[in-house]
Every structure is written in structure tokens, then in C-alpha cells.
């Protein structure tokens, strides 16, 4: 019995010491909670909320929430969002999946220790290759938007149009993308062209 306990504790210690253990636990839990315990969201463009709180493990040397933590919290919220609106299920039905191809973050005000916040996630639209999502970190103390993140979720194995059509049972025209998002997409395309030219891969497309 004691040997089993030691082995179990050793495996748990190795899991959290060698891997990003809490992340690997939280994402599946968020997906299962969204699938089993929360109602389905029929409106693809509806905003969804994911609650959080700044913990000691989230802090940087200035005792603010580490900038990298915003991306991780947004990742968990995005997984729950895509589950509730049915996108992940549709991708699975079509034998496809998505990968994060690009992201950008704008930090407006620090989140401090134990400060409660919500991640407001919404789908902004899609093109022939990717979905575009936004995550806003809103402080529950005063409603201030502390950070704004944008994501390009590239679809592999099918197209965003087919995913939406599978969900809605009809063809749906994508909404007009915000002007600032269009500029970001242009930046990504220009950056890709420059990097491909530097690598001698001008005919190869990025994700």
C-alpha cells in the first residue's frame, strides 16, 4: 500500500514538474463542462463568458498577472467557447481539426493578485481558411477591459464554410470583419510572404 502511494505521488509530482499539468487538466475539464453541464449556444456569433481569478502562480516579478497567462486563460476559454457553439463537434464529424495559426494581444491594464475577471470570447467571422476569434479580459471590479486578444484558428481537413454549413444545415455568409482585424490579417499575409521569400519557399503557403 505504501509503495503504491509513493508511486502515485511520484507520478503526480512528475506530471506537474515536467509538464504544464494544470493546463493539461483544465482544458479537458473546460471542454467536458461545456459539453455536459452547460447549454448549447445556437448563435455562432454570440459572446460567451468564462470566469477566472488571478492566483499566486499567475504573477510575474511585478506582482501582476504574467502576460503569458492571458494567452493560456484565453486558450481555455476558447476551447469551451468552440465546444458550446458546436464548432469542435462539427470539426470532429467532418474529420477535421483546427490549429492556432496567429495571435496578438493588447494589454491595457494589469490584473492583480486575486482580482476576479471574465474572458469574453466571441467569433468575429471566417474566411476560406480560418476562423477569427476575440477574447476580452474584463475586470469584475469595475468592468474595465484589461486586455484584448485576437486569434486566427486555421482549419485543417475541411473549410470554415463547410463547418458552418454542417452546423446550420444551410450555407451562411460570413459577417463583415472589423476594420482593425482586416489590417491584422494583411499584416500576417505580408509577414508570411517575407518569411517565405527569405526561406526560398515563395510557393508554399503558411497555415
Swiss-Prot record:
The gene is Them6. Keywords: Glycoprotein, Phosphoprotein, Secreted, Signal. It comes from the Eukaryota. The modification Phosphoserine is found at residue 199. GO terms for cellular component: extracellular region. It is found in: Secreted. This is Protein THEM6. Belongs to the THEM6 family. The keyword Secreted applies. Its main location: secreted. Residues 1-21 form the signal peptide. Glycans are attached at residue 188.
Amino acid at each position: 500500500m505504501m509503495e503504491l502511494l509513493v508511486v502515485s505521488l511520484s507520478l503526480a509530482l512528475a506530471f506537474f514538474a515536467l509538464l504544464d499539468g494544470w493546463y493539461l487538466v483544465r482544458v479537458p475539464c473546460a471542454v467536458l463542462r461545456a459539453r455536459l453541464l452547460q447549454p448549447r449556444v445556437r448563435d455562432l456569433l454570440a459572446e460567451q463568458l468564462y470566469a477566472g481569478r488571478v492566483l499566486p502562480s499567475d504573477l510575474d516579478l511585478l506582482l501582476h498577472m504574467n502576460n503569458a497567462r492571458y494567452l493560456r486563460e484565453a486558450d481555455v476559454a476558447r476551447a469551451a467557447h468552440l465546444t458550446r457553439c458546436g464548432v469542435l463537434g462539427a470539426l470532429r464529424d467532418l474529420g477535421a481539426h483546427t490549429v492556432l495559426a496567429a495571435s496578438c494581444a493588447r494589454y491595457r491594464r494589469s490584473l492583480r493578485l486575486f482580482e476576479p475577471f471574465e474572458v469574453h470570447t466571441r467569433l468575429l467571422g471566417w474566411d476560406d481558411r480560418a476562423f477569427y476569434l476575440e477574447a476580452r479580459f474584463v475586470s469584475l471590479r469595475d468592468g474595465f477591459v484589461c486586455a484584448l486578444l485576437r486569434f486566427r484558428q486555421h482549419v485543417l481537413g475541411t473549410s470554415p464554410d463547410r463547418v458552418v454549413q454542417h452546423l446550420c444545415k444551410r450555407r451562411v455568409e460570413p459577417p463583415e470583419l472589423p476594420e482593425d482585424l482586416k489590417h491584422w490579417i494583411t499584416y500576417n499575409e505580408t509577414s508570411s510572404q517575407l518569411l517565405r521569400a527569405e526561406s526560398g519557399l515563395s510557393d508554399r503557403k503558411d497555415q
